[in-house]
Amino acid sequence: RAARPGPTAPFHATAAGGEAARLIVEKAGGQLDMVFFTNGGAEANENAIRMARLHTGRHKVLATYRSYHGATGGAITLTGDPRRWPNEPGIPGVVHFWGPYPYRSAFHSSSESEETERALAYLADTLMVEGPHTVAAVILEPVVGTNGILVPPPGYLAGVREICDEHGIVFIADEVMA
């Protein structure tokens, strides 16, 4: 290990970091030409929000309830459970919305397809009242982890992607569990 140092702080270039970046770009099948390493998930989420705001010129970020995005100042604001309460008001511009949860549906759905349809309609309604032209990003966990392993019903993530694309909103997938 001493002969070939591993990754260090992200701002230091190392052969191991370069090789990891090359493998990530290769695995992405030509859809990436740059990799941005961070020290951890919360920092990655904070940087993703910064990039989305700079890229779109917009300020708001939509995040789901029943989510955990980290314990740093910005990431805890994105978190959609009671852990964020002692840290409020947190960073400005964060709006929470309900995602799908077929087991205890906030949308009173009777099937997974109905849950998907109603959750996507709720997201679209939230965007309408917030003003889609003010929203930089939607961040969510594709598989919710710390609030139970909550796998979204079929079609939900593709529907979120479609809504984001329609309005020029960055879709941030904070993935840890899948």
Task: Report the location of each language-model feature.
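Conserved phosphate-coordination/catalytic loops
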Residues: F11-A15, S113-A121, V151
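Catalytic PLP-binding core of fold-type I/II PLP enzymes
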Residues: L120, L150-A178
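Alpha-helical transmembrane segments of integral membrane proteins
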Residues: V144-T146
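PLP-dependent aspartate aminotransferase-fold enzymes
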Residues: R22-A137
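Short, solvent-exposed loop/turn segments at secondary-structure boundaries
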Residues: H108-S110, G148-P153
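A glycine-/small-polar-enriched, mobile loop at the entrance of the PLP active site in fold-type I
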Residues: R1-G18
